[in-house]
Amino acid sequence: MSQVIEPQLDRTTYYSILGLTSNATSSEVHKSYLKLARLLHPDKTKSDKSEELFKAVVHAHSILTDEDQKLRYDRDLKIKGLHTYQPKKNCHIFKTKAKESQGASPTLGQSEAYHRQNKPYEQQPYGFGVGKKMTSSSKSKVPIFKSFNLKSYQRNHYYSSKKERKHGSPDIDSLFHETNGASKVRMTDAGKMDTNSQFQEIWEILGKNAYTHKSYSEDPNSCLGSALSDHEEEEEAGKQQQQQQQQQQQQQHYGMTSKSSSPDEEKKNNKEPKRESRVSPEENGEEETGHKQFKLPKTSTFSSGSHDSNLQSPFYNHEYRHYARSKFECKNQFRKSVSPIKEIPATTSANEGWNILRDIIEKLNISNVDDRNKDLLFRRDEIGDKNHSDSIDIENLSIKEPKGMKRRKKDDISLEELFQSLPREKDYFMMDAINDSLESINLFKKPKTTQSHEQGGTFAQAESNRAKFKPLLEQCGITPEILDLEIPEIPEFDAVADLETLKLNVQLFNNQCNKLKETIHQVSLQRLRADTQFSDMLTQKQSIMVWKTYLEFDKSLMDKLNILQERQMQVIKIFSERCDGKV
């Protein structure tokens, strides 16, 4: 029987084919397409409808991935009212359907296949078509950790086959199993087997009565135990394992408490698990009468030579001891380091030192209290009259300084001086004497601290630094007035006919120009000296703009000098021409 996938798709819209709504994104469309394509591909499934559905999925994916076709299709869905259509819930659920395989034998039933698996190798049929293909559900469910004894296995099958030949009974396994492989053995709530007519016939053939479920499960040679279903065998194996674990835990607990308990209790505890593993004598008697030839010597599960030899050990055997030791070592490896200060115990010497110091402090406190009680701050003078009044006179009281107080300074005012300066109770305070009292007080001026001088020096230094970075224009040789000086104009020599007057005018013009030249040269020389003096300061970043203004002043000064030179050249040229013409 093979399994075939029967797909179901909602083919109302292209979105519903892919199991999506109209709001799905392109990535969701692509993911749904890949998922359905893997399931509906003709090479992957043997269903007749898979090819047609696969083509529909591919067509829907091609339309929804194309933007133009998707817009047109969405417009058509809105017109038809299917834009908000939700795919059906019962679709996109792939059901598996059982299908008969052509190669399998139709005559072979499940009971026969199950019966074949339970037979030993030498009794199994061989050839083609005698068995079924092993699947995950039909595999043996016997746990892999179950112990296997070859001799007992062969002996059990030998005895069972011998008894079948003796009684001539049919195959018992076929009677105990239905077509679906489930066991017909039914257990009641009380733990006994359901004794119907069919089972009575079976037990009459075998020559036995129905026993309790516990005796059949414990007896390895029982024919009923071999006929139980796999599910019941698993339950029995699990119960046996739980019982063994509980018995091992009890045995380990008895070993741990062997030192503290008495010898009688140790013997009693060691005997208890053995009693539990034994079967009642009535059941043993019935088993011996029915199956004397099938009985095997029972071995106690707790017979261990190592444990019997060493009863004082808390472990059942060396495996438990090895497990406990390895677990302890692993736990110590991953344990965090503990601070060594916490592990150091408090020494007695340190405690004694603290105790001595505490005793000294207590003695000092007691002595201070006694002194305060004995020495009163105010002592009353003795009065001769016995019938003295209870009123206290301030004049007769003497003030004594207590022992615990520090010595007062010379400048401090004592209580006696304060008593003399204060007015009496009946005397009124006169405001006229305030001026005299204020004048009598000597007021001393506090000297200035060194910190104030240091702060003043820092401020002065800062101001000097600012002056260095911003020098005055006069120090740099800049005189803006020289730029305002007018250059003398060229005189009109055409109106002068006399040569002597011409010479006088030329000399006057030349003298004015020379004076102006002299002042310009003096200013330029002063500027040159200032540049050499403040060269370090001018090359700093904050003084670049100042240096630029200085150079602009020098340029304007040189322009003025050039204009003056040109005018002098023109006057000399005119004077030379007039002299040549007169001659």
From Swiss-Prot:
Biased composition (Basic and acidic residues): 262-281
Bias-annotated ranges (Low complexity): 240-252
UniProt cross-references to InterPro entries, sorted A to Z: DnaJ_domain, DnaJ_domain_CS, J_dom_sf
Pfam family of the protein (one): DnaJ
Compartmental location: Cytoplasm; Nucleus
Region (Disordered): 215-313
Any one GO cellular component localisation term in the record: cytoplasm
Record-listed Phosphoserine modification sites: S229
Alphabetized GO MF terms: unfolded protein binding
Compositionally biased residues, Polar residues: 215-224, 298-313
Broad class of where this protein is predominantly found: cytoplasm
Record key words, sorted: Chaperone, Cytoplasm, Nucleus, Phosphoprotein
Every J domain range: 11-79
One GO biological process term: protein refolding
Key word Phosphoprotein present: yes
PROSITE patterns documented for this protein: DNAJ_1, DNAJ_2
Leftover remarks: Present with 184 molecules/cell in log phase SD medium.
Listed name of the protein: J protein JJJ2
Lineage, opening ranks: Eukaryota, Fungi, Dikarya, Ascomycota, Saccharomycotina
